[in-house]
Design a protein with these regions (language model features):
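Active-site beta->alpha N-cap acidic-glycine motif
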Residues: 1-78, 86, 90, 97, ...
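A short acidic, helix-capping loop that chelates divalent metal ions and anchors anionic groups
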Residues: 77-82, 170-175
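Generic structural signal for well-ordered alpha-helices
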Residues: 31, 56-60, 91-95, 121, ...
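Glycine-enriched alpha-helix->loop->beta-strand junction motifs that scaffold or abut catalytic
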Residues: 37-40, 65-69, 123-132, 158
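Conserved, mostly hydrophobic/aromatic
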Residues: 20, 34, 69-72, 94, ...
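A cross-domain feature marking catalytic cores of carbohydrate-active enzymes
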Residues: 19-21, 45-47, 71-73, 110-113, ...
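His/Asp/Glu-enriched short active-site or ligand-binding loop at hydrolase and phosphoryl-transfer sites
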Residues: 115, 119-156, 200-211
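C-terminal domain-boundary segment and adjacent tail
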Residues: 2-9, 37, 174-212
Length: 212
């Protein structure tokens, strides 16, 4: 299956919002913002986080809101650095944990750091998951809310896939000076307001694929 990064062939005024590295305490505020704008998103969850106490409740909230969940591997490694068995284990282990916790079947995956090559794709292909890239990704793990929002708003167009973050991966360096995901939440609020003014509707990857 080809990598999905943008849909250029549609007339519907939709944009797919995606969030990586959750679930986390910042996931529910993201869902509240989406609900206020009658929108949905796709949350690419980490298996190691989804396995934590209370994560199943957050995952179910995602689904109950009309949003959906994707596979972001178990431990957020750079997949090309792993052997074939380890790559497969990262996706299968995450899928098992997330599906058991959420009660849904996963259809999409996203490689950590967007690090992927032909070998990785060949290993993952039998799992039947659609790889999802993105049209744009602000450095919301480092930037303040205004900068992240401006980066996205300037580039938004029909069919875009926006990648942001509702959690922190286990291998992210601790930087006490960097914005927390609260900055990401604030940026999403600004982005959704701008989308509303421009008549753009936030949707899941599945909804983007169904757009005309």
């Amino acid at each position: 299956m080809p990598v999905l990064e943008h849909r250029h062939d549609i007339r519907d005024d939709v944009v797919a919002l995606t969030f990586d590295d959750g679930p986390s305490p910042w996931t529910e505020p993201m869902l509240d913002l989406l609900a206020a704008h009658e929108g949905h998103a796709t949350f690419f969850a980490l298996g190691c986080v989804a396995d934590a106490d209370g994560a199943d409740e957050t995952l179910r909230l995602i689904l109950e809101s009309g949003s959906e969940i994707g596979n972001h591997t178990f431990s957020h490694p750079s997949l090309p650095k792993l052997d074939d068995d380890s790559i497969r284990d990262e996706l299968e282990r995450a899928g098992s944990v997330i599906e058991e916790a959420s009660g849904t079947t996963l259809r999409y995956w996203r490689p950590p750091f967007f690090h992927v090559d032909k070998r990785v794709r060949k290993v993952v292909s039998p799992l039947g998951l659609q790889e999802v890239g993105c049209s744009m990704m602000p450095w919301d793990w480092e930037w303040d809310a205004a900068r992240s929002a401006a980066f996205v708003i300037e580039r938004l167009q029909r069919g875009s896939i926006v990648c942001m973050h509702d959690g922190r991966p286990p291998n992210e360096p601790a930087d006490l000076s960097a914005p927390t995901r609260e900055a990401s939440v604030a940026a999403v609020g600004m982005i959704l307001d701008a989308m509303s003014r421009r008549g753009l509707r936030p949707v899941t990857i599945s909804e983007l694929l169904l757009a005309r």
